């Protein structure tokens, strides 16, 4: 089989409520054991709760939170002559979105609030205010890239 062409990305259908691909991806990340309707309920209620609290539309609130968590650079291991270097590379836009959503959901799951709706809402709220563990994760990744700036010439 020839391997000339790269694989095209699978198109994700937008969600029913907001017709947004971004919300659909968040729902898919939240989903556990294929229970999409529960994941949709969690995301929609968390966004509605946060939108009421802040006083802005749901999609705008989500975009604000993601903007503050998106990484611009990350490090990748590169083996050169027997030793491994952490080489800083720029993150592609699609991966930025994916990482930001993954970090927010992971941080929300680690919280100790009553329900996932409240945990997700609080984590998004913290992300908007530039605090919380998802923002801390982005800062750690940026700090790591900054510390390894000397190895940037090993980029490929």
From Swiss-Prot:
Molecular function (Gene Ontology), one example: structural constituent of ribosome
Iron in keyword set: no
Annotated GO CC locations: small ribosomal subunit
Taxon lineage: Bacteria, Pseudomonadati, Pseudomonadota, Gammaproteobacteria, Enterobacterales
InterPro entries: Ribosomal_uS7 (IPR000235), Ribosomal_uS7_bac/org-type (IPR005717), Ribosomal_uS7_CS (IPR020606), Ribosomal_uS7_dom (IPR023798), Ribosomal_uS7_dom_sf (IPR036823)
Record GO biological process: translation
Matches recorded under Pfam families: Ribosomal_S7
Family annotation (PANTHER family): RIBOSOMAL PROTEIN S7
Function as written in the Swiss-Prot or TrEMBL entry: One of the primary rRNA binding proteins, it binds directly to 16S rRNA where it nucleates assembly of the head domain of the 30S subunit. Is located at the subunit interface close to the decoding center, probably blocks exit of the E-site tRNA.
Similarity comment text for this entry: Belongs to the universal ribosomal protein uS7 family.
Disulfide bond sites: none
Keywords, comma-separated and alphabetical: Ribonucleoprotein, Ribosomal protein, RNA-binding, rRNA-binding, tRNA-binding
Keyword Membrane belongs to the record: no
CDD domains: uS7_Bacteria
Name of the protein in question: Small ribosomal subunit protein uS7
